[in-house]
């Protein structure tokens, strides 16, 4: 007997598939491994039922999108949780995460946490940063009760992936979304300024009328697969400005509309500086590869 469903959890080689409200524990057919294909949480699949009420994933239906961090498929929103204190706010890490999501063409929501730990001047500066991301088209929330209620309206009947820096408060944020869940939370290591990786696997939790996946935290991200020439297209506000010479990488070129926008404060300086750092890293990465050949 064949059924269709969605993978809600992947753990130790087992896939937990929701088939019209029934959770079926499945293994993947060996041909997936032979073809180097891995079923992902969020995949819509066909399963073949076994006699003991378990099953085998026999087909993965076409994905509408796929994220690398977290490793999930077919999501409606990607929520990026960002700490502004303990660990310190990292614009570079935020912008790298945004690049990964933009590259997968996924709707992005940014959650800023721990604003209560900031002093007045720090808070005003952070509000300006938050407003900038809102102005360039991202949905921006805090972890306040009021914002959580607004967020629930946005993600109603949706599948959502949540990611962020270790210690940013992802699990705590999910527990605020639904008090009946009790996801393990870890204390911040004061010595490292990083959180413990309390989430060990990827799983969609049903909360009210939506599903949300919490995944292992991270302190760094790998975007080696993105070409340096493509980075500019992942910084969405750059599209609004014209440059005299095309193609323009917005680095050393003259009469560059993006650089002029930075100087006139239309583009957030820290965001452009992060772009330059990422571009240079990609450039050095390619030079190292050529040298090693």
Residue positions per predicted region:
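Structural detector for short beta-strands of small beta-barrel domains
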Residues: 1-11
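Helix-rich effector regions associated with P-loop NTPase G domains
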Residues: 13, 36-51, 61-78, 83, ...
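SH3/SH3-like beta-barrel fold
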Residues: 15-19, 26, 47, 57
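Beta-strand/loop nucleic-acid-binding surfaces
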Residues: 23-38
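Short, Lys/Arg- and Gly-enriched loop/turn segments at beta-strand edges
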Residues: 52-60, 88-90
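Histidine-anchored nucleotide/phosphate-binding helix
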Residues: 92-107
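Canonical P-loop GTPase G-domain recognition
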Residues: 117-168
């Amino acid at each position: 007997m064949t059924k269709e469903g969605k993978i809600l959890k992947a753990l130790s080689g087992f896939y937990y598939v929701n088939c019209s409200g029934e959770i079926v524990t499945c293994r993947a057919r060996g041909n997936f491994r032979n073809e180097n294909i891995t079923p992902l949480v969020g995949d819509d699949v066909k399963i073949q039922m076994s006699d003991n009420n378990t099953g085998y994933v026999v087909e993965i239906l076409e994905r509408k999108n796929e994220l690398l961090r977290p490793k999930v498929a077919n999501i409606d929103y990607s929520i990026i949780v960002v700490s502004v204190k303990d660990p310190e706010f990292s614009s570079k890490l935020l912008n790298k995460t945004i690049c990964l999501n933009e590259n997968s063409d996924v709707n992005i929501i940014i959650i800023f946490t721990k604003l209560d730990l900031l002093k007045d001047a720090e808070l005003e500066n952070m509000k300006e940063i938050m407003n900038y991301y809102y102005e360039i088209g991202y949905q921006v929330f805090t972890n306040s009760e009021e914002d959580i209620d607004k967020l629930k309206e946005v993600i109603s009947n949706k599948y959502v992936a949540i990611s962020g820096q270790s210690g940013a408060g992802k699990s705590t944020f999910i527990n605020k979304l639904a008090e009946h869940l009790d996801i393990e939370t870890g204390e911040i290591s004061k010595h490292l300024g990083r959180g413990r990786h309390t989430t060990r696997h990827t799983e969609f939790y049903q909360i009210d009328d939506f599903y949300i996946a919490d995944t292992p935290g991270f302190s760094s991200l790998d975007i080696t697969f993105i070409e340096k020439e493509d980075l500019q297209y992942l910084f969405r506000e750059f599209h609004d400005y014209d440059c005299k010479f095309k193609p323009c990488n917005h680095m050393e070129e003259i009469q560059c509309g993006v650089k002029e926008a930075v100087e006139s404060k239309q583009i957030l300086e820290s965001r452009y500086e992060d772009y330059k750092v990422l571009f240079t890293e990609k450039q050095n990465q390619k030079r190292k590869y050529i040298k090693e050949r």
